[in-house]
Amino acid sequence: MAKGGAKKAAAAAARAAANRMLADNRQARHQYEILETLETGIELVGTEVKSIRNGKANLRDGFCLIRNGELQLHNVHISPHSHAGAYFNHDPLRTRKLLAHRREIDKLRGQLDQKGLALIPLNIHLKGSWIKLTIGLGKGRKLHDKRAAEKEKQSKKEVKAAIARF
């Protein structure tokens, strides 16, 4: 009986490790109102994969563009791998191609034509053995919108704390 429980726990741990978060852009949800998300693949070289798996990616200043019918990721810093020589390492800020279906790219292009919308990288995570990037279609928030969202978040937190006391 204990043996079966150990197998289930090991399987659950393996699933959690196969779907873990590698990098997160927490600032994006503060600066943008995310209207829609899309999970895409990302074209990487070997040293980039090793660095991302070690958690050495920074999405904060990143953005996505559609050029020549392809999704591209710009300004995302992936640190050079520590155990690779200078010759074999990658450029930390290079433009990376994102992998998505043509109809998804066309849909995003149509939505981006609206004023004030942008494609923002939200997080990098593992899905099985594949590294995936979640991008969000976001509308920039004004300062008063950010304040209102912060007040709403604070009030929800206070209500939850009050309920927990009783």
Curated annotation (Swiss-Prot):
Report the protein's function.
Answer: Required for rescue of stalled ribosomes mediated by trans-translation. Binds to transfer-messenger RNA (tmRNA), required for stable association of tmRNA with ribosomes. tmRNA and SmpB together mimic tRNA shape, replacing the anticodon stem-loop with SmpB. tmRNA is encoded by the ssrA gene; the 2 termini fold to resemble tRNA(Ala) and it encodes a 'tag peptide', a short internal open reading frame. During trans-translation Ala-aminoacylated tmRNA acts like a tRNA, entering the A-site of stalled ribosomes, displacing the stalled mRNA.
Select a single GO molecular function from the record's annotations and give it.
RNA binding
Q: What is the source species?
A: Parasynechococcus marenigrum (strain WH8102)
Q: Does the keyword Ribonucleoprotein apply?
A: no
| Protein's GO biological process | trans-translation
A GO CC term attached to the entry: cytosol
Compartments annotated for it: namely: Cytoplasm
Q: Which gene encodes it?
A: smpB
Q: Which UniProt keywords apply?
A: Cytoplasm, RNA-binding
SUPFAM superfamilies attached here? Small protein B (SmpB)
UniProt xrefs under InterPro entries? SmpB (IPR023620), SsrA-bd_prot (IPR000037), SsrA-bd_prot_CS (IPR020081)
Q: Which CDD domains does this one have?
A: SmpB
What is this protein's name? SsrA-binding protein
